[in-house]
Amino acid sequence: HPTKPCMYCSFGQCVGPHICCGPTGCEMGTAEANMCSEEDEDPIPCQVFGSDCALNNPDNIHGHCVADGICCVDDTCTTHLGCL
């Protein structure tokens, strides 16, 4: 399946419909982060940059390291030692 990079947001990349992450951390639910929901209108799935990490999240455990010490899936983020 073809993929493309996820949209950019003010200080990094869109990680989910309401999450924007960059080197300094993540914003969730802000006006800037909510712009990431535009990604849902594109039928081609996007690929988040960052090494793989696992979240203890029942619906989606396959996350990406999107900032120092932060692992995200499309709807939540958590601190993660594997991302340091």
Curated annotation (Swiss-Prot):
Coiled coil: none annotated. Pfam families: Hormone_5 (PF00184). Its main location: secreted. It is found in: Secreted. Keywords: Disulfide bond, G-protein coupled receptor impairing toxin, Secreted, Toxin. The keyword Ribonucleoprotein does not apply. Targets vasopressin-oxytocin related receptors. No effect observed when injected into goldfish or into mice. Belongs to the vasopressin/oxytocin family. This is Conophysin-R.
